[in-house]
C-alpha cells in the first residue's frame, strides 16, 4: 500500500468511529453475497426462494444503513460518497420480505390469486375429510378398516382397508402396507373432489412459479445497483 492509500483508510476508520460515537453503530446482520443471484436474475433465470430471501434481507440492511446515515446529514466525512451511492429499493424489499415465509414456502399474501387458490384447496380438502370421517365412523364400514383414520397417499385422501375386504370399499387402490395386510383406498365417493383438489394444486404451483419469476425479473432489473451496494457495504 502507498502512503496515500493508508491515510485514506485511516481517515475512513476515524470517521466511522466518530459517526458511531455520535449516532450509535449501525447494525449489520448476516449479509450474504447476493452478487451471483443478482447476475443470474439479470440473465433471465428464476431464483430460488433462498436466493430471494437473501436478497430481501440484504435490501433491508441497505435500507437500515441509509436510515442510520440520514441522522448524519450535513456532516461531511470520507465516508459520505459511499453512503450517497447506496441505492434503496423499498418496493422490492417489501415485495420479497412480505411474500416469502421460508425457503420452501410463499405466503398467501404473495398474490390475491395464490390466496384464492389456497382457500379453495382448504375448503375442498375439509369437505373431503368430513365425508371420509363419516365413512370411517359408520358402524357398517368400521369392520373393513385396519384403522379408523383418514390418511394421504400421492396427495390424495385415502382410508386403510383390510386386504381381505377390498371388494367391500369401492374405490381406487393407491398403496399397500409393507406387510400387505392393508390397502390404502380412495373411495369412489371422493374421487371427483380429490381430482378437483389436484387441479387446484397444479394451479397453485403455476402461480408460485409466476410470482417467483416476477420477483426474479425485478431483481434482475435492479442487479447493478444491488451489486454496487454489496461492494460498498
Language model features: what each stretch is:
Residues 149, 153-184, 194:
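SMC-family hinge/dimerization module
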Residues 188-214:
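Internal alpha/beta scaffold segment
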Residues 115-165:
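Extended, Lys/Arg-enriched charged tracts that mediate electrostatic binding to polyanionic substrates
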Residues 13, 96, 121-124, 128-131, ...:
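Non-transmembrane amphipathic alpha-helical segments
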Residues 25, 49, 115, 119, ...:
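Ordered, soluble secondary-structure elements with a strong preference for glycine-centered loop motifs
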Residues 1-113, 117, 228-233:
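Conserved amphipathic alpha-helical "coupling/scaffold" segments
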Amino acid at each position: 500500500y502507498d502512503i496515500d492509500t493508508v491515510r485514506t483508510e485511516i481517515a475512513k476508520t476515524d470517521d466511522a468511529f466518530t459517526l458511531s460515537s455520535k449516532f450509535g453503530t449501525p447494525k449489520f446482520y448476516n449479509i450474504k453475497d447476493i452478487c451471483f443471484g443478482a447476475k443470474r436474475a439479470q440473465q433471465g433465470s428464476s431464483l430460488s426462494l433462498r436466493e430471494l430471501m437473501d436478497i430481501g434481507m440484504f435490501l433491508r440492511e441497505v435500507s437500515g444503513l441509509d436510515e442510520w446515515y440520514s441522522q448524519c446529514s450535513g456532516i461531511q466525512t470520507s465516508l459520505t460518497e459511499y453512503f450517497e451511492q447506496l441505492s434503496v429499493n423499498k418496493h422490492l424489499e417489501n415485495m420479497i420480505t412480505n411474500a416469502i415465509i421460508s425457503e420452501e414456502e410463499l405466503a398467501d399474501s404473495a398474490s390475491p390469486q395464490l390466496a384464492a387458490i389456497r382457500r379453495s384447496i382448504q375448503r375442498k380438502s375439509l369437505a373431503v375429510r368430513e365425508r371420509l370421517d363419516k365413512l370411517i365412523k359408520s358402524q357398517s364400514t368400521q369392520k373393513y378398516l385396519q384403522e379408523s383414520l383418514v390418511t394421504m397417499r400421492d396427495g390424495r385422501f385415502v382410508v386403510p382397508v383390510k386386504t381381505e375386504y377390498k371388494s367391500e370399499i369401492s374405490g381406487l387402490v393407491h398403496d399397500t402396507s409393507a406387510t400387505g395386510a392393508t390397502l390404502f383406498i380412495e373411495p369412489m365417493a371422493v374421487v371427483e373432489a380429490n381430482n378437483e383438489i389436484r387441479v387446484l394444486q397444479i394451479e397453485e404451483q403455476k402461480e408460485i412459479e409466476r410470482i417467483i419469476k416476477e420477483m426474479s425479473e425485478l431483481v434482475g432489473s435492479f442487479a447493478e445497483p444491488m451489486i454496487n451496494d454489496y461492494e460498498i457495504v
